[in-house]
């Protein structure tokens, strides 16, 4: 992240100390290109204009990033540097991560080869999947540890996505296309039944929901924003990304959580 962004955030808080200072880090649900449609954070920034200051660690390259990357190696060191800076104080830390840990090429190793008579549940390599969930959980606890060490009063806001429908539609930008991220990998394993594919992804996302509930219960000042069962089938633009209306609905859930936690934010 450019140092200029940190300096601008610092100067803004010096000029307007009543603003609610917020730090964000995340995948495409926070970093989807603004020129195509406003993502969750874009929407929140607009809704809270004049009431919150934002330091955004995510950028265009964050699309496709998994939470294990965000909280390890260079990602961990960047988060540590920001949170430990005595000149920076945050009321909230918003994080979107975990989805890319279980879809795309990351999904392939979590599936078993299809065999005759196999149920959709048999298609999941549960040992590997539970190990992956543990890695996701560990990453979030690393974040909470950093928060406790350096920004003890800050709240962490998380979510667990929504239930996608595996399909053939990629994300297109001009002549470039990216994805799909689920169906091709399931097809490669011989899991070709549409209902089985959807059941597998629903199961995995429900387990992620359980993980986030547990994280919220185990750590202080964690707000788990319940986003599952929010989007209709028509509010998905592709396998992974909501439409503009979908992003707006998800942002409304975050806005409500922010207002409950920080009453000084307006009711708009």
State where each predicted segment sits.
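Conserved SGNH/GDSL esterase-like catalytic core that processes O-acyl groups on lipids
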Residues: 21-23, 31-129
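Acidic carboxylate-rich catalytic motifs and surrounding loops in phosphoryl-/glycosyl-chemistry enzymes
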Residues: 60-64, 222-235
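Hydrophobic, aromatic-enriched interface-forming segments
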Residues: 132-181
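Surface-exposed cleft-lining segments at the edges of enzyme active sites
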Residues: 116-138, 143, 194-201
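Substrate-gating cap/lid alpha-helix
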Residues: 167-223
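Histidine-centered active-site loop/cap adjacent to the catalytic His
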Residues: 235-268
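Short catalytic/ligand-binding loop motif for oxyanion handling, primarily in non-cytosolic enzymes
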Residues: 31-33, 101-105, 164-170, 231-235
